[in-house]
Amino acid sequence: MLLMGMQKKNSDMDSLMEHLEFKGINVLNVFEEGRVNNLLWQMNTRKNNELFIKHRYIVLFISYEMLNDIKGAYYLELVKKLSEQGKIKLYVVNNHIKIKNLPKRGGWLENIICDCEECEDNYEMNCKMYQLADDIVCNVVNDIFNQNTCN
């Protein structure tokens, strides 16, 4: 599973990543410290497509930083295209942005975004990320089960 997020404050994303890894899902963070992982950015488009398709499940932490960064916009378009083609499963988490204020390039996210409201404290945030991790794991297991029964 790939995890994408460019926000400056990573505690929500780190918490979700820990919960997913605890549940047995290997997570690769595409962005490190608000920047695209250098190895990933040096890949050509074909290699990026292959990497995303190989991992199949993408968790996208949408933030203003991602929407306003050229590298973030590139990866948003990449996951949009691959998701529309059915090559990846995309889970979009709203990282404290107003859905109504999404720029045009992020408008397609409006219908698939999972809203995470502002948390009062770290405990509440951790509980929400735990629940979100549970939901993602259930969806992944259900998807794998459905693939196996169709084959």
Go through each PLM region and give its residues.
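Flexible, glycine-rich phosphate/dinucleotide-binding loops
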Residues: 10, 36, 67-68, 99-101
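Conserved TIR/SEFIR loop-to-helix hotspot centered on a Trp-containing motif
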Residues: 64-85
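Conserved GTP-binding G-domain of TRAFAC-class P-loop NTPases and closely related GTPase folds
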Residues: 118-132
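Short beta-alpha junction loops
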Residues: 64-65, 87-101
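A short acidic (Asp/Glu
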Residues: 12-14, 70-74, 102-103
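Short loop/turn segments at strand-loop or loop-helix junctions that form parts
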Residues: 60-64, 94-96, 111-117
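Conserved N-terminal substructure of TIR/SEFIR domains
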Residues: 1-61, 80-88, 131-151
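Glycine-rich, charge-decorated loop segments at or immediately adjacent to ligand/cofactor-binding or catalytic sites
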Residues: 98-111
